[in-house]
């Protein structure tokens, strides 16, 4: 068995385990009355407020907005795969947890389909060691686990970017905290902040 075949086989096994684990999470945690009491109707974020603050990713979808760049833009072959975009109803901590667990399953389904449809031939593209980008500017968006990432790049024709600005998901998502914490109980602080799943490296711009 070649390395590629073994990698595909092991990846399929791993994805099946992810799907199985997500199902266990739903049964053991999602149905737990204590967990539901601590997360339902806690840290509610409406769709209107989420969109006004530029929130994206699972947090936006948990508020009932079916927004995903993989289906809205024309990058990578996502249109060739069969998968769902999980959305919430109440925009609370429970929905944000629930959407993420369901997205684990959908991501695993995409990986399994990608392996089954992988064309034959070399896996690595032949690219030059040094890429000289033409003079100009561009902005590219991509869907990431925590939300939308944006890259604004200016090239002066040299070997590196003249200017690079990165818009991170966490930077926008964490900006909603003052709204979500208004009137909240102190014990709810950890649940609300945890449900945003932000990374400080993303927030520090």
Predicted feature descriptions by range:
Residues 4-205:
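Active-site bordering "gate/hinge" segments
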